[in-house]
Amino acid sequence: MKNRRLRKSWVTLLVLAMMITAILAGCAKNDSAANRNTSEPSSNSGGTSANAEGEAPTLGGIPTSIEGEIVVWDWDEAFLTTMVPEFNKVFPNVKVKYTVVNNNDYMQKLQSGIASGSEVPDVILGEMNFRGQLFDLDVLDNLEQAPYHFSKDQLLDYLPPLLSNTKGELVGVDQSITPAGLGYRRDLAKEYLGTDDPNELSTLLPDWNAFIQKGIEVKEKSGGAVTMIASFDDAYRVLKGQTEQPYINGSTIELTERMKVPFEKLFAMRDAGILGKYEGYTPGWNASFAKGDNIFYPMAPWSPKWNVQANDPDGIGRWGLMAAPEGGFTYGGTSVSVYKNSKNKEVAWAYIYFCYLSSEGMETNYKKLGNMPGIKSFFEEHRDWLEAGTELDQFFNQNLSLTFYDDIVPEVTGSTQTKYDSIVQTAFNSLFPLWMKDTSIGVDGALEQFKEAVKNQAPEATIK
């Protein structure tokens, strides 16, 4: 009887020990899960996933169940009508209230909203023409801080300066990269330069001196009917972009030092008679794509659609793309940012992350709209997308995406934009038609006029 009670006590103790062990194991498991939940989410990881059983799925560390409403101002209605429905498939509880705003009116509308305290968008775009002015307003959030935790290291190497303000804060991501080379008419290149192959043309035109000499030959062979670059401002855009470097320090603008070298090459082209008489983005310039009186044009990833297809719709197979002599440059471009005083920062970031950074969003944004993001991982993970090409490749008989990324991106540099960059560009635009026509004005005289025009628009600045 005593032995039976003893055996029963041992069984009871054994059962209790097993129960305690199970409870402790469960606590350890729950504690581990709690540690995972409180860790900082990575806002740059790709793919929709659930972190643990029973948890809501995330995209880039952002819960896809996130709720809220954001205001977006954009000038590309086709982008909005395509991407917003795709975004809502992943983030169904977010309402995107968008307004189509002309890019020429964007900055004025934004400044009016900020000044009056009326509606300001949560997601703000910054076209290159006014990006420095926008960044200097100090109304954009630093994307390397909470709640975004995006790192500059993820960007293509030339982009951080172009997406940072003068304090060094990363305040935007790229809507679509804009490394640029030279697009050219294959028929004219073959007739006047002897080849339409981009590699052979690069060998034939290794620098701008060779380009000018060949341009003189083209002028003579065509009786002056065919030029190398369609406009004075097109040539300036290339030459200035290739020599990108900081030249604005606070309110001091080192204009002479910055522009001397590109101006020397630009005016040499003018004096050699190899530039067309058009002004960029005028009706005549647009018509020249199909007319066939000019060989080369600055060409960024957006140009085949908006310049070639739009102006030469019958030009399938007529075009080529090559790196410019002496290197690549940026041509246009738009930053995408979060308003510093937004009440829906996490939701705004979800929109930006999906549309411009995630593989899920880029499957539509790149494949349907042709936009290439500015992050290294896209090109590392989706080389097959680039190799598949786009419908615009038929105009060039070559893979445009690979040409831009492989041949041009490695040579591109960028610099931080300020409000004075916009002023410098405005001053140039007011003067270059005169410089095109009046060949008595040389480099030194033009630089003096340039400095005076900038000073008139920025009297508080020191112009050197």
Task: Spell out what each predicted region is.
Residues E86-L156, E169, E191-L193, S288, ...:
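Extracytoplasmic "Venus flytrap"/periplasmic binding protein-like
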Residues M107-E119, L137, A189, A210-V218, ...:
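Short helices/loops that flank or line small-molecule/ion binding pockets
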Residues T64, K305, F329, T334-S422, ...:
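Mature extracytoplasmic/periplasmic domains
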Residues T64-E77, V94-T99, D122-V123:
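Short, well-ordered beta-strand elements
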Residues P57-L59, W73, T81-N88, D234, ...:
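Extracytoplasmic/periplasmic substrate-binding proteins
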Residues M1-E69, E452-K464:
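Short, low-complexity disordered leader/linker segments with a strong preference
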Residues G47-I62, E127-G181, N209-I212, I316-A323, ...:
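Hinge/lid segment of periplasmic solute-binding proteins
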Residues K89, K97, H149-D153, S164-D234, ...:
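Helix-loop-helix "hinge/cap" segment bordering the ligand-binding cleft or interdomain interface
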